[in-house]
């Protein structure tokens, strides 16, 4: 079981659950180990996760876990199954209620429920468990309450690694196949909403810089490519960009995935291309002048939920550098 080390409360709860299961003799001879890992984005990538379990930094391998797994050796590849806890959370319900019950929820191709995280410019952000097939419009407006008063929803970013969803696509069912059909992805079910007061160039820059910072630098095309795209987006945001910079971003987005070990640079490609294709007019508005919607748009990195149920964001992430250090360690600890 792998958890980020900063999640102390969650780590302690899992440890307590393990002790309770052992005391009740529910584990048997199956060894269960808890591994705490770094805060890096790539800790969630399955090949990098195996490296962390073996005591190494979260650097993705070239071979998937089902071919070479934990503690592999030349004579024993040790294929390993890596599952998200949300997947495993369905198992006891299926065992208790049966597969037919499970398939009665959701859609034929994507049965069951999913935890969907909704944040950004909505009245009621939160984490909601909903049946697969629920539309994005129902999530944003029916459950999330829509945009703040006087505003309209402009775009939705499905996490940090997929095509931006425009309002015309909000009726798409939230299932893996349906989201893929419109050129996006359901991913981990995280949706960041931006209303018409937000600048798409600046939002794209925030996500692009996040991917640049979190790139492990094993693949030069990824590290240099995400860095160049982020630099060009920042130039455009300052009002110093031009059509040439947009064309360069599009060209670089085609090569950033060369020899990739993981899907991180694919996320850069999808976000950059969709932002320019769908919101190209906003890029043009920046040519020769500063951002016409000068609103701060930080990376929406959620670290907790407060006593009122509101998300708590990592305010120090702005200090994180591409080598995974922080620009000002004193600020980080105060």
Predicted ranges, named:
Residues 11-132, 322, 327-329:
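Hydrophobic alpha-helical positions that pack around
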């Amino acid at each position: 079981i792998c958890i980020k080390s900063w999640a102390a409360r969650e780590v302690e709860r899992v440890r307590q659950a393990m002790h309770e299961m052992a005391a009740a003799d529910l584990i048997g001879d199956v060894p269960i180990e808890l591994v705490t890992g770094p805060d890096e984005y790539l800790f969630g990538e399955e090949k990098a996760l195996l490296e962390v379990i073996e005591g190494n930094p979260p650097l993705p391998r070239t071979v998937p876990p089902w071919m070479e797994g934990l503690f592999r050796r030349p004579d024993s590849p040790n294929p390993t199954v890596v599952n998200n806890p949300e997947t495993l959370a369905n198992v006891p319900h299926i065992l208790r209620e049966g597969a037919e019950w499970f398939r009665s929820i959701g859609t034929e191709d994507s049965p069951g429920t999913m935890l969907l995280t909704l944040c950004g410019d909505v009245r009621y952000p939160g984490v909601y468990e909903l049946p697969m097939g629920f539309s994005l419009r129902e999530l944003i407006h029916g459950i999330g309450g829509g945009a703040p008063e006087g505003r309209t929803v402009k775009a939705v970013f499905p996490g940090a690694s997929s095509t931006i969803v425009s309002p015309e696509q909000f009726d798409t069912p939230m299932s893996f196949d349906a989201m893929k059909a419109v050129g996006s992805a359901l991913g981990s079910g995280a949706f960041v909403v931006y209303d018409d007061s937000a600048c798409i160039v600046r939002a794209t820059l925030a996500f692009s810089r996040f991917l640049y910072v979190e790139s492990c630098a094993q693949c030069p095309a990824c590290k240099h490519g995400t860095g160049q795209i982020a630099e060009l987006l920042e130039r455009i945001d300052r009002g110093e960009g031009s059509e040439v910079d947009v064309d360069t971003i599009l060209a670089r987005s085609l090569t950033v995935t060369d020899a990739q070990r993981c899907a991180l640079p694919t996320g850069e490609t999808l976000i950059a291309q969709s932002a320019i294709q769908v919101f190209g007019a906003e890029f043009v508005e920046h040519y020769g002048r500063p951002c016409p919607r000068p609103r701060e748009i930080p990376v929406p990195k959620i670290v907790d939920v407060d006593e009122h149920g509101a998300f708590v964001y990592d305010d120090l992430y702005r200090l994180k550098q591409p080598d995974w250090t922080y620009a000002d360690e004193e600020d980080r600890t105060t």
